[in-house]
Curated annotation (Swiss-Prot):
Residues 273-439 form the VWFA domain. It comes from the Archaea. InterPro entries: VWF_A (IPR002035), vWFA_dom_sf (IPR036465). GO terms for cellular component: cytosol. This is Uncharacterized protein MJ0811. It comes from Methanocaldococcus jannaschii (strain ATCC 43067 / DSM 2661 / JAL-1 / JCM 10045 / NBRC 100440) (Methanococcus jannaschii). The lineage of its organism: Archaea, Methanobacteriati, Methanobacteriota, Methanomada group, Methanococci.
Length: 439
């Protein structure tokens, strides 16, 4: 027996399907062969450790594969593994994701500990004094290192899966497509970081949207008939205490003929679309870029719930990329495309703002738009443009919200902004300021 973890045909099929569709795992297995000649079975057993509901070790294992048992014993005998397994058991994509992340970190730690040669020697000659204990410790520390990130990546992956789904839309990706999507996210470190951040910010955006709904009471302005029990008139409530009238109440409830308040709710009024201008200049590279893209993508969730279109513009010293987005039909490829792009030039505010103006003028549906500018840059805006943009805003009822990331706002941009948001650090809560301003 080469596998150290007991598994059945269903488990084997799940692993083989993940391996077949994950080019990244195939690449990792090929690469790790230089460190651990029995790496392929280690990856397979790691998958079973995350996937199976009950994990048991095989009693009889070929001698040279017993080293994998030491590694996985170290990995699974800790609370971090148990927490991760809650997210991965019986889900082949999540289990495969955790497998990739464990293997990446384990072999990185193995290299740092300079145990590669010892492991190779053990695999070929069966010699390696104290090696099992060292590997157990490395595996244990690896699990501690990745546990939080596994949770963040899976949460982010779920966020990406849920984009483009309207209310009540239960269409699911096939297992093969889910694996390929996870593959795209995992093999690009920057996209992985953006998706991790997106998972948190999407939940924050949803909570902010729901908070506005929850705390808005509306204004009573008439009565009507229906069956909304939250808005019953007092005289209808009294009927519930009378045995005879109670049955009349039920009949009228079924017929939607109860007397209720009619609520004038401002939230029901159609809001304008959102034009996002995201700075892609050289100074945004790194954490600011990741935060900015995650914020931009998380706004799609608010737009979807409020039935608002989005127009996305990436700029540096010019407009480099633009795309009109329907939040209810956005594809995974579009999300990956937005997350992947980066340009790295200088900073110019006039060109993206001019493009935003053109979009609003060209598209009737983009009147009353919120223009959201996210930047860490400094670029002056001339007086001629200031007057032109101010006039434009009044004519088309547009609103400019300028977000300055870890920098001070320029005076000229402040002059034409309806709202200025200063982000002093890249904490998740800072994004809440933006969600409040657009929702």
């Amino acid at each position: 027996m080469k596998n150290i973890i007991k598994h059945d045909a269903y488990d084997k099929k799940a692993y083989e399907r993940f391996l077949k569709n994950s080019k990244y795992l195939q690449k990792l297995i090929s690469y790790y062969s230089q460190y651990h000649p029995i790496h392929e079975k280690l990856a397979e057993d790691t998958f079973y450790a995350f996937f199976k509901y009950v994990v048991e070790f095989n009693e009889y294992v070929e001698e040279k594969f017993k080293i994998n048992k030491a590694i996985l014993e170290g990995a699974i005998k800790n609370i971090e593994y148990e927490k991760s397994k809650l997210l991965t058991e019986l889900d082949e994509v999540n289990a495969g994701t955790a497998t990739i992340m464990f293997c990446e970190k384990f072999f990185e730690n193995l290299k740092l500990a300079k145990l590669n040669k010892e492991l190779k020697k053990f695999a070929s000659e069966g010699k390696g004094e104290g090696l099992e204990d060292k590997l157990k410790e490395i595996a244990k520390n690896t699990m501690k290192d990745i546990a939080e990130e596994v949770s963040e990546v899976i949460q982010g992956f779920n966020a990406v899966e849920n984009f483009g789904k309207g209310e009540g839309d239960k269409k699911l990706l096939s297992p093969e497509d889910r694996i390929k999507l996870a593959d795209k996210i995992l093999q690009n470190k920057k996209i992985r970081e953006i998706v991790k951040k997106l998972g948190k910010l999407r939940l924050l955006a949803i909570n902010e949207y729901k908070s506005k709904i929850k705390h808005y009471s509306g204004e009573i302005y008439s009565t009507k008939i229906g069956r909304d029990l939250k808005h019953l008139l007092p005289k209808e409530i009294v009927n519930l205490s009378d045995e005879i009238l109670y049955y009349d109440f039920l009949r009228r409830f079924v017929d939607k003929k109860l007397l209720i308040y009619d609520i004038q709710n401002k939230l029901e009024k159609q809001k304008g679309p959102i034009i996002i201008l995201l700075d892609h200049s050289g100074s945004m590279y790194g954490d600011r870029e990741i935060w900015g893209k995650a914020v931009a993508l998380s706004i799609i969730e608010i737009a979807k719930r409020e039935n608002r279109d989005i127009y996305y513009i990436a700029f540096d010293d010019g407009v480099r990329f633009e795309k009109k987005i329907n939040p209810k039909t956005i594809t995974f490829d579009e999300i990956i495309e937005i997350a992947s792009l980066y340009f790295g030039g200088g900073t110019n505010f006039i060109m993206p703002l001019n493009r935003a103006m053109s979009i609003i003028k060209e598209h009737e549906t983009f009147k009353n738009a919120d223009i959201l500018l996210i930047t860490d840059g400094y670029a002056e805006v001339n007086d001629v443009f200031l007057k032109e943009f101010d006039k434009f805003k009044n004519e088309y009822n547009a609103k400019l919200i300028s977000v300055f990331v870890e920098t001070f706002p320029t005076e000229t941009l402040k002059a034409i902004s309806d709202e200025v948001i200063k982000v002093y650090d890249l904490a998740d809560e800072e994004a809440r300021k933006i969600y409040k301003s657009i929702s």
